[in-house]
Regions:
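Conserved helicase/translocase motor-coupling segment
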Residues: 211-214
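Switch/communication elements of ASCE P-loop NTPase nucleotide-binding domains
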Residues: 30-204
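Coupling/switch segment of ABC-type P-loop NTPase heads
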Residues: 1-41, 203, 207
Length: 214
């Protein structure tokens, strides 16, 4: 993020330029619908985004947090990183495919889980006209929230596909892509040696050693 953005008033964006924050700032300034959708979602965390005009084409991207008004450069890196994902999600048109790589980076566990709700909101934002998301993630929190929302009926298992990529077993082999069937109640089989197994092991060992020390 930058402290100042020079905006071209003639630009009309439907896809963000990932190399420059100008298009993000332009969309948030000019597109009331997208800005309101973004702020509805950020409002869950007590945040609001706004664009202030300093001089003609010079603008600042501001984050309002409770009683504080902060430049985008002064908030946590996770917020500045996820903001383009939120904007592009709501900006994308029906039938489009948006690809997101590891959106959970620099986000705490609760917000990682809330990403699942964001993505559900995005695909539903065009009513019956679907948007498509391809998300590469290592976040167990995101997957567990998604599983919960399927069980609660907020999204159908038919609308979700989960693939796990296994590393090659030797230098001559290729990575293996495994599709995991998602049941109507949201359950699916975790792959071997994934986080769930480690969490279970760590919890079991923690409890065992607590009792040993008594």
């Amino acid at each position: 993020p930058k402290r100042y953005y020079f905006l071209d008033k003639s630009n009309i964006n439907t896809v963000l330029d990932t190399l420059d924050g100008n298009s993000l700032t332009e969309v948030l300034k000019e597109n009331d619908t997208v800005r309101n959708l973004v702020n509805d979602w950020l409002g869950r965390f007590g945040l609001k985004v706004d664009v202030s005009t300093l001089q003609d084409v010079i603008h600042k991207l501001k984050i309002h947090q409770n009683t504080l008004d902060l430049d985008i450069t002064d908030v946590g890196f996770g917020i500045s990183q996820i903001l383009p994902v939120i904007v592009q999600g709501f900006l994308s048109f029906k039938g489009s495919l948006t690809m997101v790589e590891q959106p959970e980076i620099h986000l705490h566990p609760k917000m990682q889980a809330d990403l699942a709700d964001l993505f559900i909101d995005v695909v539903k934002s065009t009513n019956n006209e679907k948007k498509f998301l391809l998300i590469e993630t290592h976040s167990e929190y995101l997957l567990r929230r998604l599983r919960r929302r399927i069980a609660e009926g907020l999204i159908s298992s038919d609308d979700i596909a989960i693939y796990f990529v296994s590393p090659p077993k030797n230098v001559d082999a290729s990575s293996e892509i495994l599709e995991k069937e998602v049941a109507v109640n949201g359950s699916f089989e975790w792959p071997e040696d994934f986080y769930a197994d480690e969490l279970k092991k760590d919890t079991t060992e923690f409890i065992k050693h607590l009792f040993l020390k008594k």
